[in-house]
A protein has these predicted regions:
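Non-cofactor substrate-recognition interfaces
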Residues: 1-189
Length: 189
């Protein structure tokens, strides 16, 4: 079963053997089976984000579903959100990628927007994060929900309070990125 991309601002790409990339939206928007979702814990249906989760990436890779990456000016694949917590600016992206894979009219109002208010510098005063001010301001997720509702694309919207990981040093919500990492066991000295 296939479906239409809900916010078609960027087309998925896949890397090629020669180190390049190609547009791959024809493979992307499909319902696929998985053995880690049950009806005992919910509907039995889950959205996956292959760009941001190891389990999701493995399931998508096995089904041939490409990730939703941006291609920067260096030719590197990057998630839509940069390491500072905001959507990439169009002028930071590869021109050929933008021409072939980005709906500039739809994406331009989101470029440079912070995905979580906690990462917007206006909510950090003298090195201290002002959580109350950040929560009081309109967040991008609320903005996107309202855009979907106005476009008639939202079936139902309601707020759910749930646990979300926060950094123990900054109290800011954790943003996940597909990064190569290495660790040093400092307790083994």
């Amino acid at each position: 079963m296939e479906y239409e991309q809900l916010i078609p601002w960027v087309k998925p790409v896949e890397t090629t053997e020669d180190g390049g990339w190609k547009e791959a939206s024809a493979k992307a928007f499909r319902v696929i089976p998985g053995d880690y979702v049950t009806t005992e814990d919910g509907t039995g249906i889950v959205h996956i984000a292959p760009t941001f989760g190891a389990d999701d990436a493995n399931v998508a890779r096995a089904a041939g579903i490409p990730s939703l990456f941006m291609i920067n000016k260096k030719g590197e694949t990057r998630p839509m959100v940069d390491l500072t917590g905001k959507f990439y600016l169009l002028d930071e992206l590869d021109e050929a990628f933008v021409k072939e894979c980005v709906d500039v009219e739809k994406y331009k109002e989101y470029q440079g927007r912070w995905v979580k208010n906690a990462y917007d510098p206006q909510f950090t005063i003298d090195g201290k994060y002002d959580e109350k001010a950040a929560q009081a301001a309109e967040s991008l997720d609320v903005y996107i929900c309202m855009m979907l509702k106005q476009a008639g694309l939202a079936f139902k919207m309601e707020k759910h309070v749930h646990n979300y990981p926060h950094c123990w040093r900054t109290d800011k919500p954790v943003l996940y990125y597909p990064l190569d990492s290495w660790f040093i066991r400092s307790t083994a000295c």
